[in-house]
């Protein structure tokens, strides 16, 4: 059984579903509504001034006021009268707003031998259960609603076979430790030893999903809507019902490349007709003649190619470099800890054997205790590095991947624009050929009319030298040719060139409209990702890496001091013996 086999409509909660009015997700008026007393949710009619997409869009339209994008705000304001958007949340600190905690991961059976894993989420005084497929659905919706915003990642899909067995066959409590705890292996996610890969996978999933929700709660753009509040609301037990009853979400295009980036809930026909390039599209689409649709990449395009390369290199260095080798070091220290513990037992047994010797047995006992204490100190270090260093590094790798998704989104929009340029060039070439054919036909008609206008005399006299048989053969030959011409004309009659020209001209106008929309979208997306999203990501990335390295230095320093103290005590004991 895999995560793909999960049904998205299997949320677990005893509370009844309160469908949102107007087909929207304004169940509790944002995240703040989750902490309110239980009862019928108050559905607020959304007015246009509270629409975060309009506010979000206007902040990016201003730099491009000279382009054709300036009308997006007005067009969207006319179409958005309802939806999932809730009034903006009041400004509050992270402590006031609270943090999400996943209390446990449990296996739930739905009959006929089918089962799935649910995660019990605690937020303020509310508890709700969600399954992995619902987290996945939430992220996909957020990517469409906020195509220019970095949406945090969720853990990758895994097989549920061993995953479910590890949960069902264990009495462990799968919770994250408090921030004040030592965060070692014993109290990390499972209250007990963490030696099984299945249990490590559970720890990894819970941490990633917890971080996913908390990062969303810290995102001002996302929290202006009610979608996170609805996801954490126990009244919305069935997340699939919430999605299907929302007219706003149901109206979103299947592909984010066909969404209006300034207002995805207001997708115009021009956006809906945009082509979808393949994921492997190169920045320059080549024609049949080997010539790109644009003569030369712009400086902006070259800059984004460089940024994409740097982010890919950063992700690679982090994953195959720092994270990889730090895991290896952690594993080595874990093995060393076990060796020290075994050595302590060996010295203890040796001390028992030498108990008659007096001084030697005492020294061996001191040495056994020193190795045992060293093993305990090293075990504490391993736990802190595993939880506070390795797992945050793993999360940083996934976050870097989410940042590259934004860059890839911009690259695909660039490829989309080039596809339209290539299509426009092809249609214009076709129109030119049709017009040339029309001109040639007109020239021939003029020559024929001119020739007929000169007047000709028809000789009805029978040729004297021609024999009757020869004349008959010529007559039948001309008749057969005429019959063939009529047959071909009836069977393979071509469309009127004027109709073809009109059709191609209409296609060109439609492509030009789509090209204008695509080019305008690309300008907005480029400015937003380059000037807002990526700099913010870089600042957060640097701060998180700084905290990781600071903790690493702190843990190693504390370990070195404790370890040195152990062996200093051993030397004093030997000197006093």
Curated annotation (Swiss-Prot):
Pfam families: PX
Alphabetical list of InterPro entries matching this protein: AH/BAR_dom_sf, PX_dom, PX_dom_sf, PX_Snx41/Atg20, Sorting_Nexin_Autophagy
Signal sequence extent: none
Region (Disordered): 57-81
Membrane topology term: Peripheral membrane protein
A single cellular component GO annotation: cytoplasmic side of endosome membrane
Positions annotated to bind a 1,2-diacyl-sn-glycero-3-phospho-(1D-myo-inositol-3-phosphate): 131, 133, 157, 205
SMART domains: PX
Domain PX: 95-239
GO molecular function: phosphatidylinositol-3-phosphate binding
First-listed, main subcellular location of the protein, grouped into a coarse class: membrane
Biological process terms in GO annotation: autophagy of mitochondrion; cytoplasm to vacuole targeting by the Cvt pathway; early endosome to Golgi transport; reticulophagy
Family: Belongs to the sorting nexin family.
Function: Required for cytoplasm to vacuole transport (Cvt), pexophagy and mitophagy. Also involved in endoplasmic reticulum-specific autophagic process and is essential for the survival of cells subjected to severe ER stress. Functions in protein retrieval from the endocytic pathway.
Listed name of the protein: Autophagy-related protein 20
Protein's organism: Eremothecium gossypii (strain ATCC 10895 / CBS 109.51 / FGSC 9923 / NRRL Y-1056)
Gene expressing this chain: ATG20
């Amino acid at each position: 059984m895999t995560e793909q086999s999960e049904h998205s409509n299997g949320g677990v909660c005893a509370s009844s579903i309160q469908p949102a009015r107007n087909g929207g997700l304004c169940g509790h008026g944002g995240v703040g509504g989750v902490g309110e007393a239980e009862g019928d949710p108050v559905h607020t009619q959304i007015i246009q001034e509270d629409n975060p997409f309009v506010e979000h869009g206007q902040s990016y339209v201003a730099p491009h006021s000279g382009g054709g994008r300036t009308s997006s705000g007005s067009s969207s304001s006319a179409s958005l009268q309802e939806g999932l958007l809730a009034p903006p949340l009041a400004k509050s600190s992270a402590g006031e707003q609270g943090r999400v905690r996943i209390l446990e991961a449990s296996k739930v059976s739905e009959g006929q031998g089918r089962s799935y894993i649910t995660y019990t989420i605690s937020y303020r005084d509310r508890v709700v259960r969600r399954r992995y497929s619902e987290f996945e659905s939430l992220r996909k919706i957020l990517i469409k609603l906020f195509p220019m915003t970095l949406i945090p990642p969720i853990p990758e899909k895994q097989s549920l076979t061993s995953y479910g067995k590890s949960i069902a066959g264990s009495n462990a409590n799968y919770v994250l430790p408090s921030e004040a705890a030592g965060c070692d292996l014993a109290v990390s996610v499972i209250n007990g030893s963490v030696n099984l890969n299945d249990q490590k996978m559970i720890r990894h999933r819970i941490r990633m999903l917890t971080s996913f929700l908390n990062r969303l709660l810290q995102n001002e753009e996302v929290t202006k809507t009610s979608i996170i509040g609805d996801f954490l609301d126990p009244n919305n037990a069935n997340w699939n019902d919430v999605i299907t009853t929302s007219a706003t979400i149901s109206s979103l295009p299947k592909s984010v490349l066909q969404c209006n980036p300034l207002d995805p809930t207001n997708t115009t026909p021009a956006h809906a007709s945009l082509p979808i390039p393949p994921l492997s599209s190169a920045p320059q689409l080549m024609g049949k003649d080997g010539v790109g649709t644009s003569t030369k990449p712009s400086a902006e395009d070259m800059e984004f190619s460089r940024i994409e390369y740097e982010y890919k290199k950063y992700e690679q260095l982090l994953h195959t470099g720092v994270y990889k080798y730090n895991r290896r070091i952690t594993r080595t220290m874990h093995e060393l800890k076990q060796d020290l513990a075994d050595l302590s037992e060996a010295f203890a047994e040796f001390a028992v054997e030498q108990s008659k010797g007096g001084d030697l047995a005492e020294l061996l006992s001191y040495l056994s205790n020193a190795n045992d204490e060293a093993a305990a100190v090293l075990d504490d270090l391993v736990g802190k590095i595993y939880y506070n260093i390795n797992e945050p590094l793993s999360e940083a790798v996934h976050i870097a991947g989410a940042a590259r998704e934004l860059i890839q989104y911009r690259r695909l929009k660039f490829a989309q624009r080039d596809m339209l340029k290539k299509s426009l060039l092809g249609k214009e070439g076709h129109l030119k050929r049709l017009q040339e054919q029309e001109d040639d036909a007109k020239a021939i008609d003029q020559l024929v009319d001119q020739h007929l206008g000169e007047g000709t005399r028809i000789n009805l006299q029978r040729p004297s030298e021609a024999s009757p048989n020869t004349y008959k053969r010529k007559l039948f030959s001309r008749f057969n040719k005429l019959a063939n011409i009529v047959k071909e004309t009836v069977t393979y009659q071509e469309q009127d060139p004027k109709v073809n020209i009109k059709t191609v001209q209409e296609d060109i106008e439609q492509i030009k409209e789509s090209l204008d929309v695509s080019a305008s979208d690309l300008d907005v997306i480029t400015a937003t990702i380059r000037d807002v999203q990526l700099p913010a990501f870089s600042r957060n990335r640097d701060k998180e890496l700084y905290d990781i390295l600071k903790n690493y230095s702190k843990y190693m320093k504390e370990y070195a001091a404790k370890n040195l103290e152990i062996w200093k005590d051993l030397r004093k004991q030997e000197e006093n013996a």
